[in-house]
Amino acid sequence: MKEVIHSTLAPKAIGPYSQAIATNDLVFVSGQLGIDVSTGEFKGADIHSQTTQSMENIKAILKEAGLGMDSVVKTTILLKSLDDFAVVNGIYGSYFTEPYPARATFQVAKLPKDALVEIEAIAIK
């Protein structure tokens, strides 16, 4: 059985998908862009602003599921440029404590809405 998780504190999905799905002991959070829910626009045009907002969106969705960032066991980060890797790592690291989630990071040709970063997460209940 699966349950749709939706937070009004994170942006609506921009396509035919849910913000998150909970099933059994796992919560799968869809990729989050750095979109500010109050404006529907990117929080900023820079990697720092977009990464921070992406993480805040994940945090809000997890909170709706009754979880915190300490429940995250795996993330995937998609970057427009791996040149932003160090900046993203600094921000990302501030949201977690050891043991850190497993993670994969990829550079991609293009992201939705020409975003600089997209982050998805898997959490355990």
From Swiss-Prot:
Q: What is the lineage of its organism?
A: Bacteria, Pseudomonadati, Campylobacterota, Epsilonproteobacteria, Campylobacterales
Taxonomic superkingdom: Bacteria
The record's listing under NCBIfam families reads: Rid family detoxifying hydrolase
Entry similarity comment? Belongs to the RutC family.
Q: Which organism is it from?
A: Helicobacter pylori (strain ATCC 700392 / 26695)
**Any one GO cellular component localisation term in the record:** cytosol
Q: What name does UniProt use for this protein?
A: RutC family protein HP_0944
Q: Which GO terms describe its molecular function?
A: deaminase activity
PROSITE patterns assigned:
UPF0076
